[in-house]
Amino acid sequence: MKRIALFFCFIFSFAAHANNIIVNGTRFIYPGNEKEITVQLSNTADRPALATAWLDNGNADATPDTITTPFIITPPISRVDAKSGQTLRIKLGSNAGLAKDKETLWWLNLLEIPPVEASQKNEGQNILQLAIRSRFKFIYRPAGLGNRDAAAEKLALSANGSSLSVSNPTPFYITVSRISRNGGKALNSKTVMFAPQSSQTIALSSAVSKGETLTVNNINDYGADVAVKVTVK
């Protein structure tokens, strides 16, 4: 892990370019009854790249050597050849300390480090490389929590003038992307994630009334936007 932390000491480049390593998802769910899950990396570039992966518990500034996690990523550092792929395996070492009655959220980090061109090495010039970091939601879901697809329908909405109190009584993380009247103009200005058994207040562009039925869009396990109808209490 100390070796991974050294990557954060790199000086970033003067030039920016898009990620060459593509990940096969926008979020990852670890079912409690599975031995491991896999994450597929694909290098779309014409040159190899180094990729390092680690999990954090929400502190994006924490370096890998300071993070304690029950999960093991293999390999933590890998070379992904040009036009090729690499499979990361994530295994739960021990579920001690993890809640058994609700989901736990982690973040999967991927740091892509492009190679130094041979011509630059030969010229003996100082090289500033750009390391590109991406973060993905990584949710541990204990077995026996029930149907995640129906979770958003259980959200409790309470009108409070031009704001809306939203309570999530379920054991699941629910990300609400949009609230509207019958799929019309969005009443909310930003996406909000609700932790299990938590509440938040959302500012709305116009007031809603008790008894009104709203369309609530939430993001499912596959990153798709799914609309459900919820009545304001």
Curated annotation (Swiss-Prot):
Organism: Klebsiella pneumoniae
Presence of keyword Chaperone: yes
Organismal lineage: Bacteria, Pseudomonadati, Pseudomonadota, Gammaproteobacteria, Enterobacterales
InterPro entries, sorted: Ig-like_fold (IPR013783), PapD-like_sf (IPR008962), Periplasmic_pilus_chap (IPR050643), Pili_assmbl_chap_C_dom_sf (IPR036316), Pili_assmbl_chaperone_bac (IPR001829), Pili_assmbl_chaperone_C (IPR016148), Pili_assmbl_chaperone_CS (IPR018046), Pili_assmbl_chaperone_N (IPR016147)
Entry superkingdom: Bacteria
Family according to the record: Belongs to the periplasmic pilus chaperone family.
Record-given protein name: Chaperone protein MrkB
Location(s), subcellular: Periplasm
GO biological process, one term: cell wall organization
